[in-house]
Amino acid sequence: HTEITNTYFNLKIKQTDFVLLKNSVLVKKYEFENKNNIELNVNFLVHSKLLTDYNNMVSGEVKNNTLIQYCHDYTMYTFSDKPFLSYQINNTKENISSGVIKDKDYIGMSCDSSISYDIGTLKPNEKKELTVYLYFKKSDETEEILNKELTEIKKLDVKKEEQTVEKYWK
């Protein structure tokens, strides 16, 4: 895992990444801890610029609280069991540094997308978690089957899955 402390806000972030053993899902678990003596209102932004090569166009959209990025025969789904606070497809590089992205429908090819989650207000010494899933999938299934798979992934016991992966690699 990786630990980062924002010294200005005194916010500690612990990131743990692992891949599920049974399918192509990258699990990114974040733990936020307020080391400050004041409450902190925390939002978490994810920026994705999917690019396989310069001649391979990518398109993005948001459906069912999932960022979907298409790239010819493959699709990447970015989601959590928590709802989005906001999202933006296209030109997110211009806004993301402000910490605010705007819900904006965009029709066209764009590899540049962002989503944000409301972690909420953290009291001093309080911890909260967010798990983000990245699911890489060959685009050969119906939407119904895919929605069922995404629902099952959201229901996973992340701690149990992490222990299973650790045990496998030891």
Model regions: which residues?
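Short amphipathic alpha-helical segments enriched in leucine
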Residues: Y133, W169-K170
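Short Pro-Gly-centered flexible turn/kink motifs
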Residues: L40, G120-D140
